[in-house]
């Protein structure tokens, strides 16, 4: 039985009565359609004290040989670290055939297009015919059925006694974000006009306003309804990006020059939306994020109902990575923290300050996890001198000394701020 307990003031993993230290490992050897196993590497990780390993897995819906690939890797790990516990990191992506058969469940822009999207994850890479909606109820139901089919087969394997939890993965790089931006000013595009999101948006509005009279009053728009929620246009999103471009003066400014007028299109106050004029924008982004969180909850509820003794978690909550705001993966964090089906959420540390002298701060307000008796797990995907030239230069890491110092810093930070972590051999 795996569960979270309070230990020395913070959540800790307990499995069958044993408490585990705050470092785990995610091993990326399930490389697309093959396995690259380095048993000696596994052995050394085990010797260092790491006992909980996240292994990559997909559903048999997506990969008919998913169980065979997972079992091969699990057996290789347990051969050299026999007391290891495993949390499968299971991808819930639909097949391209399903996407083609369900156009209403695919992200759609205002011009009616649903562009192709390049999906890249640890074990699956493909050009999607369209970005599947991360709030699609049809996808939830189909992927949920396939999740249980796959999990039931995993639990029949000889290694089933070493399975301690389930890590739910979907969207770009398995991190529950839309690959396509909701708003693309350069191309004059905005969304999402898919049937799935409009249903989700309407559901959110009904839950928030109760009656359409209240909705129309708050939005100052008599044309809006729960059945037909209006997607805010580009002008409504001026505060997000275009205001910064317009603020860059195209002429020289001198000390005695007149102060320039702050850019304004009638919907913003500086780099903020004017809430009184943009309640619809606020509601749009809330629904955009809550819809993704509700999908995480759908699968988490499914797992806890069928396997209550398993830990359940997912990537979600990239507050400290503001580029991801458009992609729907942070605004529903509190809802997830309040759920009994969620044990932990994870995200990598911030990428922008990983250089020497940097801090690699967190994307999550992790003290909120302590308040809610949940665990925050930082993915220490620390780049090393073994990376390609681009990352060696980007993160200023050129030799073994740089690598060791960087890893010591990141691990020390985890200990000092009292968070769980996993090492990811990026």
Where are these regions (language model features)?
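The substrate-binding groove and active-site-proximal loops of carbohydrate-active enzymes
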Residues: 21-32, 53-67, 124-145, 204-205, ...
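Structural preference for beta-strand elements that scaffold enzyme active sites
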Residues: 22-24, 52, 83-87, 163-167, ...
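Aromatic-lined substrate-binding rim segments of carbohydrate-active enzymes
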Residues: 37-120, 141-144, 151-155, 298-306
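Acidic (Asp/Glu)-rich catalytic clusters
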Residues: 42-47, 73-83, 158, 334-340, ...
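Short catalytic/ligand-binding loop motif for oxyanion handling, primarily in non-cytosolic enzymes
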Residues: 62-63, 94-100, 172-178, 320-324, ...
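Polysaccharide-binding and catalytic clefts of secreted carbohydrate-active enzymes
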Residues: 102-336, 342, 359
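Hydrophobic targeting/anchoring helices
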Residues: 307, 313-426
